[in-house]
């Protein structure tokens, strides 16, 4: 058996790679790990999911695994991933389980596990759980020692009270289009923005289990651009299937990506004295324009590998207060233990109201260098990335770019893809060099 955990939990096509049997085994193994690492007593796990069709099957299997090992399951239903992380701490649960494949297509699903306080697991803990999956079920409690299932009726309201802390001023007079991706934010997202005072126009907020992320949300911005322009809205915010991401569109329909959002929020926090150590944490995928904008403002930038778990690790290690990814995962540890798209949207709108500036004006503090990202599907990520022909193509591109740009070659942690990213002084060069390297990867993969 290969490694189960990727960069963001366990993922696969539901009922093919991610089966009910595997979900049950993961639930049981997580419960066993908890029993071996803590003292005696009744244990509780928060369990949530996004609305994709396979979620109910996997939820039932995970809960069966947990309860078979004596852990009570606190079922919160369809809620965003950051809600499950928050509620794990708010309910003083021993751990949390989120069933979601985030921005992936509907047939996929995933299982993400949070430790105490809603923090993501480290590699050693994931390895321990994997070893317990391989070993099979442990001792089975009987009678009153079997875990129970409890429905947390107040879960959504508790989460909404939490995210309201992100909004330090009323948003009255602001019109926002919210794209919920037919996902986990479909109910709580519009409620959160309306509670803050904004006029909300919601789109793609009618999940039926089959339409999550289907040409909508943060990976398909055409609909929200059109809606912002049609309604004359001040901005649009787009979430993904589990609402841990937020991308924005300004009143002109132009994209404000995670890099630009981080610049806006970093400057706001610096001004308020809330940017710890005057430092922003981001990944190697962030545009060079972010680094230049932060240098001009006197903000340090700490760079990590790709994946919000690495951003989170650096935030915790340095006790920093803001980090994120270009993809829209924005983390503010003072407001949550993981990326929260709704919190990000509220903070962005708060800055607009506080300054009286448009989103376009705020985002203009960062000048984006042309960046081209090509996803290349391969059968063997490691072999393709290491192929001599690919390395030669990368070397040629780096020689041409010199100090005026950069190239990154990165295997996806969740999909059979290698991502080729090139930044250059002009778009033609970025496209040409990215295509050249992508062709080499495709031929090798």
UniProtKB/Swiss-Prot annotation:
**Entry's EC annotation:** 5.4.2.10
* CDD domains the UniProt entry points to: GlmM
Q: Where is the active site?
A: 102 (phosphoserine intermediate)
- According to UniProt, the name of this protein is Phosphoglucosamine mutase
Q: How is the cofactor bound?
A: Binds 1 Mg(2+) ion per subunit.
Q: Which GO terms describe its biological process?
A: carbohydrate metabolic process; peptidoglycan biosynthetic process; UDP-N-acetylglucosamine biosynthetic process
Q: What does this protein do?
A: Catalyzes the conversion of glucosamine-6-phosphate to glucosamine-1-phosphate.
Phosphoserine, modified sites = 102
Assigned keywords, A-Z: Isomerase, Magnesium, Metal-binding, Phosphoprotein
Q: Does the keyword GTP-binding apply?
A: no
Q: Which cofactor does it need?
A: Mg(2+)
Q: Which GO terms describe its cellular component?
A: cytosol
Reaction it catalyzes:
alpha-D-glucosamine 1-phosphate = D-glucosamine 6-phosphate
Residue numbers binding Mg(2+):
102, 240, 242, 244
Modification after translation is described as:
Activated by phosphorylation.
UniProt xrefs under InterPro entries: A-D-PHexomutase_a/b/a-I (IPR005844), A-D-PHexomutase_a/b/a-I/II/III (IPR016055), A-D-PHexomutase_a/b/a-II (IPR005845), A-D-PHexomutase_a/b/a-III (IPR005846), A-D-PHexomutase_C (IPR005843), A-D-PHexomutase_C_sf (IPR036900), A-D-PHexomutase_CS (IPR016066), Alpha-D-phosphohexomutase_SF (IPR005841)
Please name the Gene3D superfamilies in this protein's record. Answer: Alpha-D-Glucose-1,6-Bisphosphate, subunit A, domain 3, Alpha-D-phosphohexomutase, C-terminal domain
Annotated Gene Ontology MF terms? magnesium ion binding; phosphoglucosamine mutase activity; phosphomannomutase activity
Q: Which Pfam families match?
A: PGM_PMM_I (PF02878), PGM_PMM_II (PF02879), PGM_PMM_III (PF02880), PGM_PMM_IV (PF00408)
What family name appears in the similarity comment? Answer: Belongs to the phosphohexose mutase family.
Its ancestry begins with:
Bacteria, Bacillati, Actinomycetota, Actinomycetes, Mycobacteriales
């Amino acid at each position: 058996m290969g490694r189960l955990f990727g960069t963001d939990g366990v993922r696969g096509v539901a009922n093919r790679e991610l089966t009910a049997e595997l979900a049950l085994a993961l639930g049981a193994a997580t419960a066993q790990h908890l029993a071996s690492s803590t003292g005696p007593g009744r244990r509780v796990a928060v369990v949530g999911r996004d609305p994709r069709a396979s979620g109910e099957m996997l939820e039932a299997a995970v809960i069966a695994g947990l309860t078979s090992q004596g852990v009570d399951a606190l079922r919160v239903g369809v809620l965003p991933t950051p809600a499950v992380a928050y509620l794990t701490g708010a309910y003083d649960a021993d751990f949390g389980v989120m069933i979601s494949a985030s921005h992936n297509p509907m047939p996929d699903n995933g299982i993400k596990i949070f430790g105490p306080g809603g923090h993501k697991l480290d590699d050693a803990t994931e390895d321990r759980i994997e070893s317990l999956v391989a070993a099979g079920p442990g001792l089975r409690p009987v009678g009153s020692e079997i875990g129970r299932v409890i429905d947390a009726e107040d879960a959504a309201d508790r989460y909404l009270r939490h995210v309201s802390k992100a909004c330090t001023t009323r948003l009255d007079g602001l019109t926002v289009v919210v794209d919920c991706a037919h996902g986990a934010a479909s109910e709580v997202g519009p409620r959160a923005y309306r509670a803050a005072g904004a006029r909300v126009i919601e789109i793609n907020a009618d999940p039926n289990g089959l339409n999550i992320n289907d040409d909508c949300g943060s990976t398909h911005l055409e609909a929200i651009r059109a809606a912002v322009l049609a309604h004359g809205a001040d901005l649009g915010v787009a979430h993904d299937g589990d609402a841990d991401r937020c991308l924005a569109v300004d009143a002109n329909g132009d994209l404000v990506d995670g890099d630009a959002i981080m610049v806006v929020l970093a400057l706001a926090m610096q001004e308020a004295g809330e940017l710890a150590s005057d430092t922003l944490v981001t990944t190697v995928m962030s545009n060079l324009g972010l680094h230049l904008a932060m240098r001009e403002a006197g903000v340090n930038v700490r760079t990590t590998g790709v994946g919000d778990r690495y951003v989170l690790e650096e935030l915790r290690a340095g006790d920093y207060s803001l980090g994120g990814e270009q993809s829209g995962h924005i983390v503010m540890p003072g407001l949550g233990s993981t990326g929260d798209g709704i919190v990000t949207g509220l903070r962005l709108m708060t800055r607009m109201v506080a300054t009286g500036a448009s989103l376009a004006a705020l985002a203009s503090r960062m000048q984006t260098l042309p960046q081209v990202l090509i996803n290349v599907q391969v059968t063997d990520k490691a072999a393709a990335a290491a192929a001599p022909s690919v390395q030669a193509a990368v070397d040629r591109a780096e020689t041409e770019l010199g100090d005026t740009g950069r190239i990154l070659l990165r295997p996806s942690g969740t999909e059979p893809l290698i991502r080729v990213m090139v930044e250059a002084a002009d778009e033609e060069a970025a496209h040409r060099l990215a295509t050249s390297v992508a062709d080499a990867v495709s031929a090798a993969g």
